[in-house]
Amino acid sequence: NETAKQFNTSIIVYLIDPKYFADLPTSQFWSYATYFRVLSFEYLSESISTLLYLDADVVCKGSLKPLTKIIFKDEFAAVIPDNDSTQAAGAKRLNIPEMNGRYFNAGVIYVNLKKWHEANLTPYLLTLLRGETK
């Protein structure tokens, strides 16, 4: 409450039962945190069109205002690609060679929630992760 008062805002905490994700794969690369993020994108897409997602450990050293200049067309998100060595290591670690060159920092995502919602992306991703589709 004190933090909310200090910044003249409100803080809403949502409690989500992790059993909702019990049938999804988890590993050091796919955690419940990843699934909560996807679910939050779906929920927020009902009321806002874009969202800047930042992990709690991200330090912003400058203004984020330039991000507001990004105009989405058909893109789901704007992401920051990892450097080449991290790209290669991530692809190898995940045993997905085709990820090399496509690996990005999932802790900083500017999401086009309007497109996310229109494409019904959350149910699609959860179905894919559950192995219910090819």
Question: What is each stretch, according to the model?
Answer:
Residues 1-134:
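Glycosyltransferase catalytic domains, chiefly GT-A lineage
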